[in-house]
Amino acid sequence: GPNTTINLACASATAAFGVAEDWLDADRVDRVVIISGDDVTGDDLWEWIAGGFAASGAAATNNVVEETALPFDRRRNGLILGMGAAAFVIERHSEAKQRGVQPIAEVLGSTTANSAYHGTRLDVEHVGQVVNGFITNMERRWGLDRHAMAPNTVFFSHETYTPARGGSAQSEVKALRDTFGDSTNKLVVANTKGFTGHPMAVGIEDASMLYGLKTCLLYTSDAADDLGR
């Protein structure tokens, strides 16, 4: 069957779900195995990757981890690099049934976008447009209502303790408010980076999301004592 390598920086593992969806919809495959891994803290990559983040001003400046891993916190001052690996199996219902496997979740849709805006900053307006467009498409496709599903929705945040302007925190909060309006405060926002650091392309958030669906347990950060923007 087909195989490929996805390189969308720290969105690579998540983007692979979209490729899997396309392959299944096109009847190219019946099952896709996604394997993701990154070891940027290892001896081979550390000087290059850490040096790049430090040069761009994105690396944390505080050497006390508990005071640094602060997603959405007003005190955040940069990210901590992490490492890890994850694997996922995406297959047709018939294949899972044949194997006697109970699926954890169903993929209803995906989207991928690139604003070509900046290497280390986000186009805040474009992020909001993409999220709103995706939710609108899912509403039409599956007969959903964003306000009805908001109280039962968990948003897994990518926020990596970025700067107050032009970073993940500002982009994500604005995108959610533009998309869900008055229902935004009914959403649960989960973020794993207070525990894992930023493991680049690994997809720890995807694995944590699926584990949360299976166990009804969510890992939220303790570092929101002084919420910023």
Where do the language-model regions lie?
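Active-site histidine-anchored catalytic micro-motif
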Residues: A16-F17
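Short conserved active-site loop signatures built around small residues
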Residues: A13
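Short, solvent-exposed loop/turn and secondary-structure capping segments
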Residues: D44-E47
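Short, high-confidence coil segments that cap the C-terminus of an alpha-helix
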Residues: R28-D30
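Conserved "HGTGT" condensation-loop signature of ketosynthase/thiolase-family condensing enzymes
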Residues: G1, D22-D25, T41, G52-I80, ...
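Short beta-strand-to-turn element immediately C-terminal to the catalytic PLP-Schiff-base lysine
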Residues: I90-R92
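Short beta-strand segments
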Residues: N7, V32-D38, L108
